Amino acid sequence: MSIHPAFRARRARSLRGGLPAILLLAALLALTVSLPAAAQIQPQQEDALAAISPHLESQLAAGNEPVSFLVVLDDQVDAKAALQAAEFAAAEPLDRTARATELYHTLTRRALASQAPLRAWLDAHGVAYRPFYIVNMIEVRGDAAIAQALRGFAEVDRLAANPFMFSQETAGLQRSAHFLSSHTFLQGQEAAPASRMTTTQLPYGLVYTRAPQVWDLGFRGQGIVVASQDTGVQWDHTALKASYRGWNVQQAQANHVYNWYDVWGEDSCTTDPQIPCDDSGHGTHTVGTMTGDATADGLAIIGMAPGAQWIGCRNMLDGWGTPASYAACFEFMLAPYPQDGDPFTDGKPELAPHIINNSWGCPPSEGCDIDSLRRVVETARSAGQVVVASAGNNGPACSTVQFPISMYAAAFSIGAHNSDGLLAGFSSRGPVTADGSGRLKPELTAPGVFVFSSVPYNNYDSYSGTSMASPHTAGAIALLWSAAPELIGNVDLTEQVLVKSATPVLDSQCLPSATPVSPNPAYGYGLLDIYAAVEMALTPWQAVVKVTNATDDPQDQINVVLVDQLTGYTYRTSTGFNGLARIPLLYYGTYSLRIGEGADLLVIDGIRVEAGSEPVEGTGTDAQWKAAYRIERRTDVFFPSDRLFLPSVVRN
């Protein structure tokens, strides 16, 4: 049965009303043809079947009509490990495009092979489905009999619900009352009207984060592509058109292919789903905060990175989305493809954006599949994309950062503060308890109260929500990467620069002790300061460590670990035959050096590297090892080969 892109369109329509005739026919066919052995399973064999989520069980038991659900396969690619293996096999590091291409081919190959038996069965029985490769799963529309049959396939790990949910971030949105058109927005509390800006007034969020000072250095996001996964975008908005990657200013025409994708197909808000549109205004607002320039309308620059380009994907329908629709946009961002194309064969990973903004939430309490979306975000991160996520609008209670994707370690989660730097009451707090991790979230806070930006019909308005804080950060990263291109694709170190340069705020909310500390579950590491981040990135350091034994003989293959005592970031390397180990890129802070392992561990604490300081040198000894270190400013060119020595952060 046809799966691209018709199923997406049929699914969208059926979610809002009755089943289309073609799906009714498919359902009847599925019931009338004989099922394979996988479906002929007796009740006593239940233990041998793949797991099924309680939410999906309830949906299937509620009636005989087909529902949308996810078939998650057992064979899943560890994207990070796959790329490490590819670099090892190549005997050299891969650049960003090569890494993205290698990952795309690995994911699609594995998914095609393992999905083949299921897809053949689904085709034979006329069952509508949509396969994915970014996580190895298939979205299926079927009834209880279809679900039971699929549970019997050896390739299947579990079945999960794919509920149609109203985004928690758009639901919590607050707007000012002076919007000029009659366009109906998502429901939200009305806020006090914001006064209209003049050409001399920048939005406070840009000023507070010191973006203009970065522009003065010549860095405006040039060469960087940011992405919006949201309710859509008015691409030809006066403030956004020039920064749209699909707009050719010389030819005065647009090419939307590879620059826009509408998951909802024929339920697009335009007659042609290949043309960007926005059915709520939320997405247009967030893109404006990333790249908008309203000077042509007699206003000011409204975006953090007016020199960056943007692309978009509509993952929500009237503010409603599903785990599958969210995953589909991530898949487009990993390797963009045409609206009518096949993501498995038509993807172009070389056109993938650098940074992906996500101002939406997917509640597990309503059936959102935590594990699948976690793997999706981890894969995007492994590809070198920064996944920025709004923390949520469920504050001020503790442990309210509880929804995908902001709850994940692989996402960079952002809370909201006002023009005075005070945390917004609605901003969700950590720690993350939904998965039992106790993970510190959010990482940072950014402006998110009465944020002035673009909205549909060439208008402007002020919104409040962590949805507004997240694009401030996504735009800030575009500035950072345009200033320090050696960080492009290195998500770990990019996050380190952002959190280490943030303005710390002492707070005791959601902590076991009443003593205010930083970082904390309210503000994270503090308030976003992109000028300080760029300053830090432009003054990198390097460390060289020499390890000898008690008789001064160089020691080979000895573990050397440098730990940032503020963030817990861990650099791991080992000595060569000359006893030397090098950590090529780090930033000022306080570190702990650890030599060896287990009972033979030599620890040197309190190594302080300060901005503008002279090289830091020291030694340490114990009964087995002698270690001498030197940490100094880097003034040479950052070579891509250094990535071989850059470890990943140890994340809780």
Could you say what each language-model-derived stretch is?
Residues 42-43, 60-66, 82-83, 158, ...:
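Subtilisin-like serine protease catalytic core
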Residues 215, 220-222, 293-297, 312-410, ...:
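Substrate-binding/access-modulating region of protease and related hydrolase catalytic domains
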Residues 287-290, 311-319, 400, 448-518:
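Hydrolase catalytic cores
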Residues 255-269, 277, 338, 419-471, ...:
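Catalytic-core environment of secreted peptidases
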